[in-house]
């Protein structure tokens, strides 16, 4: 979506799944008080506190350990603080008005990874897209989890049908 905001040769973009703030995603796996502490420590560049706190939490939470390990691997960073510095650049805030293409937003209602509020926030902040299609998959249809784990074909079918609609009319 960031690319689509700046590259007008892109005529359609799919957010599978939505993600408008990477830092928020990677701190939402923590309890509220810990999340607030990490946000405050990050604003004060307290790398030692962040690394210590996340290190302790990773020992207690498989999800937090996986999320941080995977994130540091993908971003080629060595510490949680470096990872958070990298993530702070992964935001769509202020870029939504630059999305003028056809846009498809996908999310799962029970996503364990990306807070559902990001789906609603992004949906509410895209005003200049040629078209905006939003799909929140449910548990009942088997698509309520992150990237529709358990029913990938539901998402794939939705994307393919949407692409047929978009490119069939342009």
Q: Where are the regions a protein language model picked out?
A:
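Primarily recognizes the serine-hydrolase "nucleophile elbow" in alpha/beta-hydrolase
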Residues: 1-36
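Helix-rich cap/lid subdomain of alpha/beta-hydrolase
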Residues: 22, 32-68
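Active-site nucleophile elbow and catalytic-triad environment of alpha/beta-hydrolase enzymes
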Residues: 77-95
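Short beta-strand/loop motif that positions the catalytic acidic residue
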Residues: 99-100, 105-107, 111
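Conserved alpha/beta-hydrolase "acid-adjacent" motif
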Residues: 112-118
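Catalytic histidine neighborhood in serine/cysteine hydrolases
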Residues: 123-144
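Catalytic active-site module of serine/aspartate enzymes centered on a nucleophile-bearing elbow/loop
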Residues: 138-170
């Amino acid at each position: 979506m960031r690319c689509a905001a700046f590259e007008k040769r892109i005529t359609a973009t799919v957010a599978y799944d939505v993600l408008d703030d990477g830092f928020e995603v990677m701190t939402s796996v923590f309890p509220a008080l810990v999340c607030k502490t990490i946000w405050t420590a990050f604003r004060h560049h307290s790398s030692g506190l962040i690394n210590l706190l996340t290190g302790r939490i990773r020992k207690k939470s498989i999800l937090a350990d996986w999320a941080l390990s995977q994130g540091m691997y993908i971003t080629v960073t060595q510490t949680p603080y470096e990872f958070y510095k990298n993530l702070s650049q992964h935001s769509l805030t202020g870029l939504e008005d630059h999305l003028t293409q056809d846009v498809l937003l996908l999310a799962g209602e029970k996503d364990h990874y990306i807070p559902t509020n990001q789906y609603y926030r992004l949906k509410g902040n895209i005003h200049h897209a040629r078209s905006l299609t939003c799909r929140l998959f449910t548990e009942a249809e088997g698509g309520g989890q992150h990237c529709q784990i358990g029913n990938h074909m539901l998402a794939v079918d939705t994307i393919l049908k949407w692409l047929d609609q978009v490119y069939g009319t342009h």
